[in-house]
Design a protein with these regions (language model features):
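Hydrophobic single-pass membrane-insertion segments
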Residues: 19-33
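Small-side-chain structural scaffolding
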Residues: 14-17, 63, 78, 139
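Hydrophobic membrane-insertion alpha-helices, especially the h-region
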Residues: 7-22
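N-terminal positive-inside, membrane-proximal cytosolic segments immediately preceding the first
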Residues: 1-6
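Periplasmic/extracellular, small/polar-rich flexible segments of pilin-like filament-forming proteins
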Residues: 84-173
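Conserved hydrophobic/amphipathic alpha-helical signal-anchor segments
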Residues: 31-102
Length: 173
């Protein structure tokens, strides 16, 4: 009988140890799974935060470009007035009746230059997203009698220019 009691007691202790080991293993596994899920959630939140910051920075850059383009829109009017008065497109800021290129400053604009044929080039600093970036406005005189001077906007520097200026196109160099 004593032997049977020892066998039952040792079996009970063995089962108890096995249950404790199982629950300890299960809790450790669940803790690892929970930690991995929390780490993934934190990583997603960080990626989302970084994406939001990048989008906000891009939007600030585009807004700076938009504001500067609106602020200097009178330069296109001056070029057209010069053309209407003289019959030819101006080849410089002075011929268009505009101040020197470097006097044009804005949120990110550092200069505005009128070149041969009335082409207007806006140069930007790093606040635009591309230090030294440029946007060019080319006059189109093909329908000047019926529609007036039309302007074509293009850039080689701002890939997402259409987000800032809907009518502007990006062409890689």
């Amino acid at each position: 009988m004593r032997h049977a009691l020892i066998t039952i007691a040792s079996s009970f202790i063995g089962v108890l140890v096995a249950l404790i080991a199982f629950y300890t293993w299960r809790d450790a596994t669940q803790a690892r799974i929970q930690a991995a899920a929390e780490a993934e959630q934190q990583a997603r939140a960080e990626r989302g935060r970084q994406l939001s910051e990048n989008l906000l920075a891009e939007e600030r850059e585009f807004q700076a470009i938009r504001n500067d383009v609106v602020a200097v829109s009178g330069a296109r009017v001056a070029v057209v007035e010069s053309y209407m008065n003289s019959g030819r497109m101006p080849a410089s800021n002075a011929e268009a009746g505009l101040p020197a290129a470097e006097t044009y400053k804005g949120h990110s604009l550092v200069s505005l230059t009128v070149a041969e044929g009335g082409a207007i080039t806006l140069h930007f600093d790093a606040a635009s997203g591309v230090d030294g970036g440029a946007i060019e406005w080319l006059p189109d005189l093909t329908g000047v009698e019926s529609m007036g001077v039309q302007w074509e906007c293009s850039t080689h520097d701002f890939k997402q220019i259409v987000r800032a200026l809907a009518g502007c196109t990006y062409t890689p160099r």
